[in-house]
Amino acid sequence: MIVFGLSGGAGSGKSTVAAMFAQSCNAAVFDADKIVHSMYSGDAIITGLVAKYFPDCICNGVVSRERLSKHFFSYGPLWLEFQSILHSIVLRQQRKFILEQGKIGRDYAVLDVPLLLEAGFWRCCDFVINVDVHKSLQWHRLRQRGLSEREIEFLLSLQMPRGSRRNFADFYVNCGGRKGEVLKSVLQIVGSLNAGRHRFRVARKKLAMRSALDRRASTMASA
C-alpha cells in the first residue's frame, strides 16, 4: 500500500484532494480533523484530557469546541502541553489506520492531517503531496470559515512557509482551479507511480529536512 500525506496551509484544499483520491482510486482517507472532532463529542479519554487542562470547555460532559478554540488562539504553555498529548493520540490512531488498511489490501491511503510536516506525521508517509492555492483565495476561504484577519495570520504563522513545504514535497497539486483540473493532477500522480517514476526521490529529501523539522517541532513544543 502506498501512503500519501497531504501538506498545505489552512484553506489550501487538502480535503478536496483527499476526496479526489477516494473517488478516483478508492483510497482510504485518514481525516485527522474529523477524528478529533468525533473524539471531542464522546471519547472519555479526550474529554478527560480537556477537563484536566481546560475545565471551562466541558459543557454537559461534551467538549465545547468554540471555547476550546479560544485557548488555541491564546497558545499558552497549557495549550502546547495539551496539544502535544493530543498529537500523540492522533498519531497512534493514524498508525492503526495504516495497518488496518494495509491488512485489507488497500492500494492507497491518504493522510489529511494539519501540521503534517511541522508535527512529524509525515514519517508514516511514502510520499508527500503539497497542496496549495493563491494566497488571496486561501484567505477568502478562511474568512468564509468565520476567522478574523488576526486569527488567519496567527494560524498561518504556525505552518511552514510555502516554499519550504513545496521543496519538501514529492508532488504538487494546485487546488485553485476547477475540480476536473485537480482530479487530473491526482491521476497524474498515481500514473507516475504506476509507471515506476519518483520511487527513489523521497528518502534523500526527507533525510535532508528531518533535522530542520525536528528543530521546529521542538521549538513549538517548548515555546
Curated annotation (Swiss-Prot):
Catalyzes the phosphorylation of the 3'-hydroxyl group of dephosphocoenzyme A to form coenzyme A. This is Dephospho-CoA kinase. Its main location: cytoplasm. It comes from Anaplasma marginale (strain St. Maries). It is an enzyme of class 2 (transferase). GO terms for molecular function: ATP binding; dephospho-CoA kinase activity. Residues 3-204 form the DPCK domain. Its EC number is 2.7.1.24. The gene is coaE. Belongs to the CoaE family. It comes from the Bacteria. ATP binds at residues 11-16.
